[in-house]
Amino acid sequence: ASFKAVWKSVLEKLPKIAREFSIAGYSLCDGVLLSVQPEYAERIMEGKKRIELRKKFSRKWEGERVCFYASRPVAALVGEARIRKINVDKPAHIWETYYSDIGSSKDKFDAYVGTATEIYALELTDVVPYRNWIPISQLTHLLDNDLVPPQSYCSIQNSESWSAAVSVAGLLHGITRNPGAMAL
């Protein structure tokens, strides 16, 4: 069989494979994908930024896996983490509480917040940087599917394209077997 035919077969089986394996204990096809500016993505992966800010988000992601997409010019999946806790509060209180873990200056924080009356502070833990950042162009080629990065975030399991992309990224990075998973 040609490589293309074999690869197509692999991609068809990928969702089942992804459910059977994990990175850091999290399924490869669950969680949320966050778009992050490259400078902040790098700080998160280095452990220098432990709080990610969002103007809009959902508390349903607390305790869940988060995958990071570094926006242009990097345009790559860079790693993942777990959202330990989500705090929603007035911007002044968020800054006061987390300024040393936000990874930006007060001026940049204020510019981002703008006129928002509340902001979400996502406490990140269990950060797993990918050994090599995986460019969206490489994933688009491997999946033969255009990937449109989310403006802010999206559910991985609700996006067939991103579910496949994140699964491939996990396979390229390295995976471990889920305890108790069924045999393939």
Regions found by a protein language model. Name each.
Residues 1-31, 35-57, 62, 73-78, ...:
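Contiguous surface segments at macromolecular interaction interfaces
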Residues 67:
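Non-catalytic, usually N-terminal nucleic-acid engagement modules in DNA/RNA processing proteins
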